[in-house]
Regions:
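A short, glycine/acidic-enriched catalytic loop
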Residues: 200-204, 276-312
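N-terminal catalytic or cofactor-binding beta/alpha core of small enzyme domains
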Residues: 13-264, 275-280, 374, 382-387
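Active-site-adjacent substrate-binding region
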Residues: 313-340
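N-terminal Sec-pathway targeting helices
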Residues: 1-15
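Soluble periplasmic/extracytoplasmic beta-strand elements of cell-envelope proteins
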Residues: 179-184, 233, 267-272, 299-301, ...
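Solvent-exposed loop/turn segments at secondary-structure junctions
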Residues: 187-190, 238-242, 273-278, 305-308, ...
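Active-site-adjacent mobile loop/cap segments within catalytic or ligand-binding domains
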Residues: 336-387
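Alpha-helical scaffolding within the catalytic cores
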Residues: 252-255, 280-288, 339-345
Length: 387
């Protein structure tokens, strides 16, 4: 056999053994992304989606009206599918060391990250924005109101069937034993002081002042639970100061201790603030008009397990997420963004009523966020209140 044939056969072996498998692997990894881009491009071409990359000037933004939250069942939001992706994932940063950070009582750290006395900078735009109803492969409607955004490999048909099932626990609204736990893995997340069309970039959007961070939103939830007679615990430990790293490890330890002491608790709600920002730095303030007032729109996150996350009962959390979503939409039309069902953990293995709730974003005012806390509390009180 001459050297030319030998070389050709060697090249053929290399192509079959290495190049083709590598190409197939790379295509498999990218196929979903290419498909999604193609779907979006087709949607743009057909007028289904309207990208919102070109921004108006600050003066135009100041006079821009809030999109009405009164959406009919058949109305599709005019916002871009890209905008739905702008909300970043909650960072579940593990502890750097093997030692879990110790949470700190809120009263001990009140002045550690003070809320700014004034914000004179005007170097960023805040745009009000209302998430509506969406069409597309990832979305399906709930019978009771609201939507789910399915970012998993499970089919929408399967999840729709599950969404109609009742939640898998019972709340004793007449019991003196706590039934609900409200806590905040990222308690220092904060908001704008007032309803504004600009922000000061020197403000970190974090504070240990409990009147201006997530603790105040939790307080509003709990005030309504009080009125409904539902026993609860509001854990005000600060898990993300002095270090953000390991905050989920810290809150997990605290929640487990509370559940051991109070096994009557069925529902654990980790209440956060989102951070939605365009590439040009514009911050979005998701809002809905509820009974003549602006409320920060909320998003429920329900985690799915791909078999590696230790959450065998994740579907029971999903049942509760759908029930709560529909109850909120029934009570306060337009308050919710679609439930995010995705491969997330967020300590949702600890009960079968564990959810994460994002209230507004860093473009919202503290008043808008606190009002949403009040509305969440009213709905929970209606769902679980006793006679």
């Amino acid at each position: 056999m001459d050297i030319k044939k030998v070389c050709l056969r060697c090249v053929a072996v290399i192509i079959v053994a290495f190049v083709m498998p590598t190409g197939i692997w790379l295509y498999a990894r990218s196929a979903s992304r290419f498909g999604r881009v193609a779907a979006v491009a087709a949607g743009v071409a057909m007028g289904e989606y309207k990208p919102c990359f070109a921004m108006e000037s600050e003066t135009d933004t100041a006079s821009k009206p809030v999109v009405s939250n009164k959406l009919e069942a058949a109305v599709v939001s005019k916002h871009s599918i890209w905008d739905m992706d702008m909300a970043p994932q909650e960072k579940q940063t593990p502890s750097v060391s093997s030692e879990v950070p110790s949470p700190l009582p809120a009263q001990d750290v009140t002045d550690k990250i003070p809320y700014p006395a004034s914000m004179e900078g005007n170097d960023g735009v805040i745009e009000k924005y209302t998430y509506g109803r969406y069409d597309g492969e990832q979305y399906f409607d709930l019978d009771g109101g609201g939507q789910v955004r399915n970012c998993t490999d499970l089919s929408n048909d399967e999840l729709y069937e599950e969404s109609s099932k009742p939640y898998d626990f019972q709340i004793d609204g007449n019991s003196s034993e706590p039934q609900i736990l409200i806590y905040h893995t990222h308690a220092t997340e904060s908001f704008e002081p007032t309803d504004k069309d600009h922000y000061d970039s020197s403000f970190s959007c974090k504070t240990t002042d409990p009147e201006m961070n997530m603790l105040s939103v939790g307080d509003k939830i709990c005030e309504q639970l009080d009125k409904a007679g539902v026993a609860y615990i509001h854990d005000t430990l600060v898990h993300d100061y002095p270090s953000y790293d390991g905050s989920y490890d810290s809150s997990r330890m605290a929640v487990k201790q509370i559940l051991e002491e109070y096994p009557s608790i069925k529902v654990c709600l980790d209440v956060h603030r989102d951070g939605i920002e365009r590439e040009d730095g514009t911050r979005l303030a998701p809002v809905a008009e509820i009974e003549g007032r602006e409320a920060a729109q909320l998003m429920i996150i329900s985690g799915c397990d791909d078999g590696t996350m230790g959450m065998p009962d994740y579907m029971k959390n999903f049942h509760f997420a759908c029930a709560l979503q529909s109850a909120l939409e029934s009570d306060w039309q337009g308050l919710t963004r679609p439930v995010l069902f995705d491969y997330r953990h967020y300590n949702q293995d600890l009960t079968i009523g564990s959810l994460l709730i994002e209230v507004g974003s860093h473009g919202n005012s503290i008043t808008q966020a606190q009002y949403t806390g009040e509305l969440i509390g009213k709905t929970l009180g209606e769902m679980f209140g006793g006679e």
